[in-house]
């Protein structure tokens, strides 16, 4: 589960490497896959689309905590990862790295189509 002050990896090519969760949308205490969080960039790559210290929205695509599927199997990722999005819900990057759990919300279909592997 993702909560405030959680350090997250960025799973796209927007230019950010690591971000810090500074808020959760919807008044929750923790976020899971498919939830939108408010993040601040902590480390960036040169010539990226984002700036260090700026605030962005992001969608959680991977969490370390185990997730039980309806068939009884369990999925566990090795890292907590997000994809940065703009105010309209579209991803800032053009590629998504690593596996992505199927996002239940229909508003993030673009992220699932950019992903290499959808579980």
UniProtKB/Swiss-Prot annotation:
Keywords, sorted A to Z: Ribonucleoprotein, Ribosomal protein, RNA-binding, rRNA-binding
Protein purpose: Binds to 23S rRNA. Forms part of two intersubunit bridges in the 70S ribosome.
Superkingdom of source: Bacteria
The name this protein goes by in its record: Large ribosomal subunit protein uL14
Subunit structure: Part of the 50S ribosomal subunit. Forms a cluster with proteins L3 and L19. In the 70S ribosome, L14 and L19 interact and together make contacts with the 16S rRNA in bridges B5 and B8.
Gene: rplN
Coiled-coil annotated residue ranges, if any: none
Single GO term (MF): large ribosomal subunit rRNA binding
One GO BP: translation
InterPro entries, sorted: Ribosomal_uL14 (IPR000218), Ribosomal_uL14_bac-type (IPR005745), Ribosomal_uL14_CS (IPR019972), Ribosomal_uL14_sf (IPR036853)
CDD domains the UniProt entry points to: Ribosomal_uL14
Organism name: Wolbachia sp. subsp. Drosophila simulans (strain wRi)
Entry GO CC: cytosolic large ribosomal subunit
Family membership: Belongs to the universal ribosomal protein uL14 family.
Pfam assignment, any one: Ribosomal_L14
PROSITE patterns for this protein: RIBOSOMAL_L14 (PS00049)
């Amino acid at each position: 589960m993702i909560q405030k002050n959680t350090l997250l990896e960025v799973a796209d090519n927007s230019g950010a490497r690591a971000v810090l969760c500074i808020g959760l949308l919807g008044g929750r205490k923790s976020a899971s896959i498919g939830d939108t969080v408010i993040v601040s960039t902590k480390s960036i790559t040169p010539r990226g689309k984002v700036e260090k210290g700026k605030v962005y929205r992001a969608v959680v695509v991977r969490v370390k905590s185990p997730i039980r599927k309806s068939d009884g199997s369990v999925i566990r990722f090795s890292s907590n990862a997000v994809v940065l999005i703009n105010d309209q819900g579209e991803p800032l990057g053009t590629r998504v790295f690593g596996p992505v759990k199927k996002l239940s919300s229909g508003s993030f279909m673009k992220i699932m189509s950019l992903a290499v592997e959808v579980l």
